[in-house]
Amino acid sequence: MHSVAWWPTVVVLAIATFTDLRSRRIPNWLVLPFLVAGIAVSCWLHGWSGLWESLGGMAMGGVLFGIIGLMGGMGMGDVKLCAAIGAWIGPTQMLVALVLTGMAGGIMVLCWAVAGGFLGDLFKGTGDLVFGFRKRGFRPPENLALNNPLTRKMPYAPAIAIGTLFSFFSR
C-alpha cells in the first residue's frame, strides 16, 4: 500500500461509519468515487502493475464479502465499501484487513448482543445460519434475513473501519 492511500481511506471510513451508524446505509455517492479514485491513483503511481494490484484488492474485498452479502449476511453497501478499500490497499493488505474486520465484527456483535440482552438468540441464530444452509439453499433463516424488518441489524462499517485501520499498523 502506498502512503497516499492512508488519508483518503481514513476519511471515507469515518464518513461510512457515521452514515452506517446513523441510517444503516453506506451511500454509493461515497463508495463508488472512492473505488474509481483508488484504481486511478494506483495506475498513476505504478502503471499497469498498479492497475492489477488495485483490481486484485477490489476483487479480494468484493468477492469475499460479496459471498456473505449474497447469502444475506451483510448489506451490499458493506461489500462495496470493502471492494473500494481493496482498490486502494491491494489484495495482500485487503486480506489482512478482512481477517481483522471479521475479528472486530465478532467482538462487536458479542458486545451488542450482551448489551441488548439477546445473546441466547444470537447463538441460536448463528447455529441456524451455519447448520441450516444446506436445507435452505444457502439463504439465511427468515428470522435473520436482512430484508425482514424484525431482524436485528448491526451496522458493520465500524468493524470494517477498525479492521482496515489495524491492518495499516500490522505492516
Give the positions of each predicted feature.
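A membrane-topology feature that recognizes alpha-helical transmembrane segments
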Residues: 1-171
